[in-house]
Amino acid sequence: MHCPFCSENDTKVIDSRLVADGHQVRRRRQCLACNERFTTFETAELLMPKVIKSNGNREPFNEDKMVGGIQRALEKRPVSADAIELAISMIKSKLRATGEREVPSKMIGNLVMEQLKDLDKVAYIRFASVYRSFEDIREFGEEIARLED
């Protein structure tokens, strides 16, 4: 790694520690030319797969779009911010775990519904009604009946 002070190539690691619950490594380094010390942080680069829309278009995964849908479904529901954040993290982990470069938008919707079903049944029905385009009250009733089984 280049020294930020003198741009020398030769630096050595003095100390390494895990930080951020083991998701990041903090390293103290010393330049062998000017003896200045500096800190670096190392994290894994985790790329999200691209999304294949129902019309066949491909676009980058948009976390804000997913979070917005989840938050709308959970609006005025007694679910903590921590629980919501954990659900979002689990969805993203499952998407990365597929190992695919592209995933269908339907998969993301199903993962969201799976998490909402565990978080709050009312939020699940709200999301499902939009996601599955419920046309009438009968479809709501059928989905509620499936929840009760």
Swiss-Prot record:
Which cofactors does the annotated protein need, by name? Answer: Zn(2+)
Can you give the residue ranges of the ATP-cone domain? 49-139
Q: Which UniProt keywords apply?
A: ATP-binding, DNA-binding, Metal-binding, Nucleotide-binding, Repressor, Transcription, Transcription regulation, Zinc, Zinc-finger
Q: Which residues form a coiled coil?
A: none
unnamed zinc finger locations on the chain: 3-34
Cofactor descriptive note: Binds 1 zinc ion.
Q: Which Pfam families match?
A: ATP-cone (PF03477), Zn_ribbon_NrdR (PF22811)
InterPro entries reported for this sequence? ATP-cone_dom, NrdR-like_N, RNR_NrdR-like
Q: Name one GO molecular function term.
A: DNA binding
GO-annotated biological processes: negative regulation of DNA-templated transcription
Q: Could you tell me which HAMAP family the record lists for this protein?
A: NrdR (MF_00440)
Which family is it part of?
Belongs to the NrdR family.
Matching NCBIfam families:
transcriptional regulator NrdR
User: What does the UniProt function comment say about this protein?
Assistant: Negatively regulates transcription of bacterial ribonucleotide reductase nrd genes and operons by binding to NrdR-boxes.
Q: What is this protein called?
A: Transcriptional repressor NrdR
Q: What is the lineage of its organism?
A: Bacteria, Pseudomonadati, Pseudomonadota, Gammaproteobacteria, Vibrionales
